């Protein structure tokens, strides 16, 4: 499944209070691509994902899907906040989307348990979310998104609230699951290292109103792991991205706008 954003813009409010958050966003994903989206705080990254997910209407432009995904929905969105249901146990949380699609009980539980095994949580299947750590709850959200079998997976800083060690583990787990299933992924992050480690390309956004500054191919072979971050190839690319995006971060920090991330 491929996705194209054609000239997406978004304005919140009206008249003198109108705020342009996104302006002329145009890009295409490739089949099975992992696309990292990187930009300063408040540039509209989360707004863009919500438009792609159909949760927000763009002020202008359109989102176009092409290709077939008969086994599942068009997209699934994983937020920074895990968004799991506290009254359901772990297995029922993962199986929820399949239940809504009418998948028979045994089939949905078998599929959900398989993904819980992949994220190391099968032994917690009957536990309630409050019994688990924040990192474990985010693993539940990731397992639920993949088992739902979306054509395109949208991830809005899913590791942003985690401690550094847990973040590294989940990055590695995500890479392994993605490698097995090759879903098209659009992954929003503030972290340059994360964008390079995970992505096939890195889409850089300007400060608000968010525009595409450039799209940089990563060009580092797979499979990847944390050790690649010490290679000259990785460090050179990291500096290349930082040199491109630094001025946008400085604009955001200086308060050239009063935007916030919607």
Predicted feature locations:
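The feature captures the beta-strand-to-loop junction immediately N-terminal to the Walker
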Residues: 38-40
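Helix-to-loop junction immediately C-terminal to a conserved catalytic motif
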Residues: 53
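Conserved ABC transporter NBD signature motif
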Residues: 61-71
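Short helical segment in ABC ATPase nucleotide-binding domains corresponding to the A-loop/adjacent helical element
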Residues: 91-99, 109, 217
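Conserved ABC ATPase "signature" region
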Residues: 99, 106-124, 176
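Conserved ABC ATPase signature
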Residues: 128-132, 136
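A short, proline-enriched helix->beta-strand linker immediately N-terminal to the Walker B motif
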Residues: 147-151
